[in-house]
Amino acid sequence: MGREIARVLGAGRKENGYMTGNGYMVTWTYGNMLSLAMPKDSGTAHVEWKDFPLLPPSFLTVRHVKTDTGWNPDINAVLQLKVIAKVLNACDTIIAATDASREGEMLFRHLYGFLGCKQPCLRLWISSLTDEAITEGMANLLPCDRFNNLFLAA
């Protein structure tokens, strides 16, 4: 999805994990790069019913994968999150172009919050990746706060 949008926007210069050009920086996620934090992520080794509700300081963490040494952060997710943070920090305004759905909105909002992003954001709301749909969507960007209820519904 990101590469198609980058092509239409004229951001054809390939970088490590993102594309640039024509005044845009376009990056992407793959799957859910964040997951819910487990009790051990906040230093709690053993949890009992009396401990609930258990609300860690941050309820999101980088997705973990099972390896020979146990559950460890997904290194590919860690690396791409660093790229996304770099791109977000370099921009004055963020254009959220995740899937036009509750889940897409939630994915963006979780990343935005997890990375501590403060820049204003606009929403590219398209249901097709045709050149025409992307061009029309870019001409009709909406403030992200118009989608607050969609995020809350997710």
Regions found by a protein language model. Give the residues of each.
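Intrinsically disordered, low-complexity regulatory segments
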Residues: 1-154
